[in-house]
């Protein structure tokens, strides 16, 4: 994993070093008609600037200067002739009416761009109205992800602040060699389905040095995700870092080679979680490493849930997802529930190869009840000091 992490960092670093080595041609969105007054629709200006830059034979830079720019759905298509840079010094805001982007699935989407750097600035999707619609049980649009990378390769996303997404803040799908660095993601703890970063069907993904405070998973890792390195994340509020949910279909792709390290979880619903539906599936989750983690009053610091069902109409079968080779090392802190370690695995496909090493999790309880471990259909071993006492 160390070699993969180094290669990813080196590749994406080359993208922003190029502009230091050769002149970059700037495409200022204001020159294409954008106005940073917060209420003039600048969507067409942004699209024209992107289109011109994408056709450029010089090293292009789409530039958003200081100001507040109202934009509707932005579909930024490749492939482009050169590596692209998209630099935001201002703030992008969505229309106040959530329907303006709510039916588009994505607010800002980069599609089939190979060699892309997105820097800085703030995007604010103004999701409050959409969340109210969802909570009120009304007929609502599907909701939009704030920024999505689809079929993109060699991508750097750095320094972005994402506020109040209708749904997922940052999405990565069918992409490779993507580095997300020093982003800040914020939405209220009660905002529904506002995952911070969601990765699916992608490989070679690094997420580093970021603060994620939201209403759902800080980071969610979906089927088909391979070779991920997640480090120095401040997570909370939210639902923790989750692999899954998995097992929604029989022919689902697996998840493998994931590392989560040197991160802090504060008052989250879960810490590190693997979740799968209780139904047949050919999926798997294997070669997973969770190390050097601090839990601060976290609901379930260590959790495998193979009977995942957050709502009604649960399948109530046996999960076909095979969970194996999972290591938890140097995980310390406090749990807000008594079950600090919970492995609720499949009867037909027990979890195997679980390793607990140097764990110290105490129950944050005014009655001083000790933390406990719960295991069902889980097989593994322990090393060093493990608190609470391991099932293995």
Name every feature range the model reports, one short phrase each:
Residues 2-392:
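Extracellular/periplasmic carbohydrate-active domains that bind, remodel
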């Amino acid at each position: 994993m160390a070699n993969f992490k180094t290669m990813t960092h080196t590749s994406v670093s080359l993208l922003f070093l190029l502009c230091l080595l050769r002149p970059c041609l700037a495409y200022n969105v204001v020159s294409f008609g954008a106005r940073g007054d917060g209420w003039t629709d600048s969507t067409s200006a942004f699209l024209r600037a992107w289109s011109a830059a994408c056709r450029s034979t010089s090293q292009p830079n789409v530039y958003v200067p200081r100001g507040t720019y109202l934009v509707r759905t932005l579909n930024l298509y490749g492939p482009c002739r050169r590596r692209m840079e998209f630099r935001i010094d201002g703030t992008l805001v969505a229309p106040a009416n959530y329907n303006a982007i709510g039916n588009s699935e994505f607010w800002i989407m980069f599609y089939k761009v190979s060699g892309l750097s997105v820097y800085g600035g703030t995007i604010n999707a103004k999701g409050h109205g959409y969340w109210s619609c969802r909570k009120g049980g009304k007929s609502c649009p599907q909701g939009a992800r704030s920024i999505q990378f689809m079929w993109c390769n060699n991508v750097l996303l750095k320094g972005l602040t994402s506020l109040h997404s209708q749904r997922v803040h940052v999405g990565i799908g069918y992409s490779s060699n993507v580095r997300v660095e020093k982003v800040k993601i914020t939405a209220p703890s009660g905002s529904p389905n506002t995952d911070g970063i969601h990765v699916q069907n992608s490989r070679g993904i690094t997420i580093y040095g970021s603060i994620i405070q939201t209403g759902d998973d800080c980071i969610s890792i979906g089927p088909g995700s391979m070779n991920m390195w997640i480090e120095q994340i401040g997570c909370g509020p939210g639902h923790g870092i989750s692999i899954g949910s998995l097992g929604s279909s029989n022919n689902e792709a697996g998840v493998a080679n994931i590392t989560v390290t040197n991160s802090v979880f504060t008052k989250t619903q879960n810490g590190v979680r693997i979740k799968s539906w209780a139904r047949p599936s050919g999926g798997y989750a294997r070669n997973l490493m969770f190390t050097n983690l601090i839990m601060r009053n976290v609901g379930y610091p260590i959790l495998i849930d193979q009977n995942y069902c957050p709502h009604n109409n649960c399948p109530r079968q046996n999960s076909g997802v095979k969970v194996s080779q999972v290591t938890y090392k140097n995980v310390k802190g406090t749990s807000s529930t008594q079950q600090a370690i919970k492995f609720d695995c499949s009867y037909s496909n027990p979890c195997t190869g679980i390793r607990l090493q140097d764990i110290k999790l105490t129950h944050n309880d005014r009655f001083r009840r000790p933390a406990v471990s719960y295991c069902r259909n889980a097989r593994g071993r322990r090393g060093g000091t493990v608190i609470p006492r391991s099932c293995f």
